[in-house]
Amino acid sequence: MRYLTAGESHGPGLTTIIEGLPAGMPLLAEDVNKELKRRQGGHGRGARMRIEKDQVQITAGIRHGKTLGAPVAMFVENKDWKHWETVMSIEPVPEKNEKSRRVSRPRPGHADLVGGMKYGHNDMRNVLERSSARETTVRVAAGAIAKKLLHELGIEVAGHVLEIGGTRANLTRDFSVSEIKETSEASPVRCLDEVAEKEMMQKIDDAKKNGDTIGGIVEVVVGGVPAGLGSYVQWDKKLDAKIARAIVSINAFKGAEFGVGFEAARKPGSEVMDEILWSKEDGYTRRTNNLGGFEGGMTNGMPIVVRGVMKPIPTLYKPLQSVDIDSKETFNASVERSDSCAVPAASVVAEAVVAWEVAVAVLEKFDGDRFDTLKKHVEEHRNLTKEF
């Protein structure tokens, strides 16, 4: 299973095409729209979220509420397009209009300058329009379909915010996937700790007041995962590696870790490895989950626990020093409309990309042509691993 996305931040809209979904899977536009709505929420979002009310148009691959096994095509309109029709026109425009909203002062930390160098764009709007996090809209749409597939197989995905601007949630116990969903949905910053939530919101407000931005850490948990997804036989078959790549591919994300993560470097092996247990009811389990559900690049049946770190958004309303590519003089960087903190929304994007990689691994391991046989094979596999 694979997908491609297309579209610019202020163009007519965003498109994604998914290939490889099994036939016969239940799927409605509402399954996607509810995830798009979640992405647009969160304390710290900018003015554009008051303009865009994302709704998906499914244009291919589904009939009467079920997938056909053919490519699924989806389109999300940019409501703000009406204000940018000339600037972002597909057809040539008069020279005076062509220079309108031209960007010649790249923003530090953004793709502007290097993208312009790479593709020869002397108007860096050609770079920022595609490198914008607006593209994650259709990544969330694709992830919504992956989450639907996993849900039908008894696999659930939930994300939450662990840290914003140095304020970290104090979680004194493990939360189930259902608890994470319920608690995070009720929080303006998708945090499971009410005390930390208030501090996070204050830090976001302070950053906005100062024309600054702040980043944070998100965590995604996947429950009900069967053992044996991914493989140890080749480096590129390891599922945790694929998930790490997916996390770091999200705009502004700079790292990923599983389970206890980098803390494993500070502990002896006896405090890191997860002891193996067995019972007739549950089969093989682990006493702890320090490795985040992976051993040898394969799922071990415990929940997948992965975290991603997001840097502050590069667009600052109090811009940093940059250089004009025309005159080579020092100026303040360009300012584009942006958020002061997008960490809560990024947790939804992280859910989507993790769900996608897990769904791909499921389809690689089991027959993916028909959804009814897929469900049967997954259940058979669960029983086999339990009895091993």
Curated annotation (Swiss-Prot):
InterPro entries: Chorismate_synth, Chorismate_synth_AroC_sf, Chorismate_synthase_CS. GO terms for cellular component: cytosol. FMN binds at R130, S131, S132, N251, A252, G296, K311, P312, I313, P314, T315, R337. It catalyses: 5-O-(1-carboxyvinyl)-3-phosphoshikimate = chorismate + phosphate. Transmembrane segments: none annotated. Keywords: Amino-acid biosynthesis, Aromatic amino acid biosynthesis, FAD, Flavoprotein, FMN, Lyase, NADP. This is Chorismate synthase. The gene is aroC.
